[in-house]
Design a protein with these regions (language model features):
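Short, well-ordered coil/turn residues at beta-beta hairpins
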Residues: 35, 169-175, 180-182, 191, ...
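Phosphate-coordination loops involved in phosphoryl transfer and adenosine-cofactor binding
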Residues: 28-30, 122-123, 221-223
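Rossmann-fold dinucleotide-binding core
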Residues: 205-228, 234-244
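Beta1-alpha1 glycine-rich phosphate/pyrophosphate-binding loop at the start
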Residues: 3, 31-34, 38-101, 229-258
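A charged, well-structured terminal subsegment
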Residues: 374-388
Length: 388
């Protein structure tokens, strides 16, 4: 999953605890988690396991917006913990079942009733703000997180269906969007997956587009790999590809290659061609991507196509005009401390705010890494609830 994600089509059911008998959720959750990929799921399970009430808000439940792993439609991950091989959709199903096992319910601990477990809600988070708690409401961060989410269909000309949730802590696990090259785009489309519908036909298949050389390079042992990128992105993929093959071609799609003389010499010594022509169209059969047609009419064929055009962090709901001033890297990913707490621009941890998975700066964007970061953030959020 190196380099993930968390559009809205239909309304979801009210909050449920995923039991035979619906359990009433708390008015204020101990932990809210935005995102239900490996990092979000692990955060939720870890916090629930520590007897906390957890709300998971899942964009994919009400939209076409899916995490990077989900789009591996026919390619099996072989480095996901426990599974010898599993596709993205099957992994998503397994994560869902895992969270559902942490039933939202009431328990009594030390004579005091407490909500514990996981409640899940389909929704696209629009805004997160900090609000003062009502008198008597436990707020270990000094405030509560108010989360506004669209929980109904997004249709032109209709008002948003929104709901507001409150939590004592928040784990951001919404990942990022991969930026895709403009090849065979559908002009006038207003959604990402409509704009790139032809490209997505070939995404996540063995003979198709890949976004992670560490994850999918093994599919093309000693085969021809095409790298569609430029600059550091292209260099990183090409260096990774050498572990799997010696047959590599770089296509910059009209961009300046942006390689130093030393890098160009290294590529030339290994017979790696750098093609700077713009790419005009896909050459495919069914869901298999066979090659790319260039603007000159030249056709370049390969067995696998690895792309990197950068990313867009899914953290727009933490807007500066709502009082958020967070520390990020150059790509907008959140900087955290050793406990998974998000840092403010001043370098200090923001009380109650944590992050995990691909949204975190400076981490390997891999499934196992996401699980580890998720557990760290989930446990840190859970520990914040302790009275002493």
């Amino acid at each position: 999953m190196e380099r993930g994600t968390t559009l809205v089509t239909e309304a979801s059911a009210p909050i449920e605890a995923h039991t035979d008998e619906a359990q009433t959720p708390p008015s204020v959750f101990d932990v809210a988690v935005i995102g239900s990929g490996p990092a979000g799921s692990q955060s939720a399970v870890s916090a629930a396991h520590q007897t906390r009430s957890v709300l998971v808000i899942e964009a994919g439940a009400v939209s076409q917006r899916k995490g990077r792993a989900f789009w591996s439609k026919s390619v099996e991950f072989q480095d996901a913990p426990v599974f010898p091989g599993i596709t993205g959709p099957r992994l998503a199903t397994a994560l869902s079942a895992w969270m559902s096992a942490q039933v939202g319910r009431m328990v009594t601990i030390g004579g005091k009733p407490r909500h514990v477990g996981i409640w899940r809600r389909g929704g696209m988070v629009l805004r997160v703000t900090r609000v003062e708690p009502d008198e008597g409401v436990h707020a270990p961060a000094g405030y509560l997180f108010a989360i506004e989410a669209s929980t109904g269909a997004l249709k032109a000309g209709t008002e948003l269906t929104t709901e507001r949730f409150l939590a004592r802590s928040l784990v951001v696990a919404s990942g990022f969007e991969d930026i895709w090259p403009d090849i065979d785009v559908t002009e006038g489309a207003d959604r990402l997956y409509q704009t790139h519908r032809i490209l997505f036909r070939y995404a996540g298949n063995r003979k198709g587009w890949h976004v992670c050389i560490r994850c999918d390079g093994h599919l093309h042992l000693d085969e021809h790999i095409a790298v569609v990128a430029s600059g550091d992105f292209a260099w990183s993929i090409a260096r990774g590809a050498q572990d799997f093959t010696g047959h590599i071609t770089i296509l910059t799609n009209g961009a300046d290659p942006d390689f130093s003389d030393a890098r160009l010499e290294t590529l030339a010594a290994r017979n790696i061609e750098v093609i700077t022509e713009p790419i005009a169209a896909h050459i495919g059969k069914g869901t298999d991507l066979l090659g790319l047609k260039l603007s000159s009419g030249r056709e370049v064929f390969a067995d696998g196509f690895f792309v990197d055009y950068g990313l867009k962090a899914n953290s727009e709901y933490l807007a500066s005009n709502d009082g958020w001033n967070l520390k990020t890297d150059d790509e907008g990913l959140l900087v955290v401390d050793e406990d998974g707490a998000v840092l403010g621009a001043d370098g200090n941890a923001v009380p109650g705010l944590f992050a995990a998975g691909d949204i975190v700066a400076g981490q390997r964007n891999l499934i196992a890494t996401a699980f580890g970061l998720g557990q760290n953030a989930g446990l840190s959020a859970a520990d914040l609830m302790r009275e002493w």
